[in-house]
Amino acid sequence: MKMRLHATTTSPFVRKVLVVAHESGLMRDIELVPTNPHTDESLRLDNPLCKIPTLILANGEVLFDSPVVCEYLDSLHHGAQLFPKDGLERWSALRLQALGDGILDATLSRRMEIMRAPTEQSPEWIERWMLASSASLDWLEQHAHLLEEPIRIGHVAIGCALGYFGVRFPDDDWRTGRSSLAVWFDRFDTRPSMRATSHEALSKLPPTQIKSGGPVARQ
């Protein structure tokens, strides 16, 4: 029996899980369940937070959110691991994952705020989320050497964050003044796992038709 993943094709956190599934060669073991977390109350039966991604295991157990789901998937294969087992390398990978997830949180919050009626928007919160994103991108530019390590979960989180930021706020031009980060992202974005889960690729297909790119070698 396959695992079942509550998902939408637009969620960057779902994309993060799918990238890990591709990297681990597990896409064939996952059935994607199209789910709108805002309207589908059946999701709450599996996850009281009613958030995606939510993974239902073959034995009926349920896992959420993306860091938990990603680490679980990474534990199911015997290839190079995205989650180091221990030591400083593990904490470095988890720190980068937290930063990437934080950029995604700020980007999503900012987008939701600007979709409100102009009279209901909070300029203070919009500014705060913009600052969180720009400061994080500056930090990554200053610490770009951390991205040259073997591919870990932090790289996946940062890659998904940059991809989503570029789609939702293209006018921000995050690349200006961050050439090292831009070079890294352009290279990372060519990975089969990133290509198969790009915004353009997923927007053309219903979730149940997402194809597996198979496992790929780590850098």
List each model region and its residues.
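GST-like domain detector, emphasizing the conserved glutathione-binding G-site
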Residues: 1-123
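Generic structural "secondary-structure junction" signal
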Residues: 45, 51, 84-85, 153, ...
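Non-transmembrane alpha-helical segments in soluble domains
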Residues: 70, 74, 94-97, 137, ...
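Long hydrophobic alpha-helical segments typical of transmembrane helices together
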Residues: 175-219
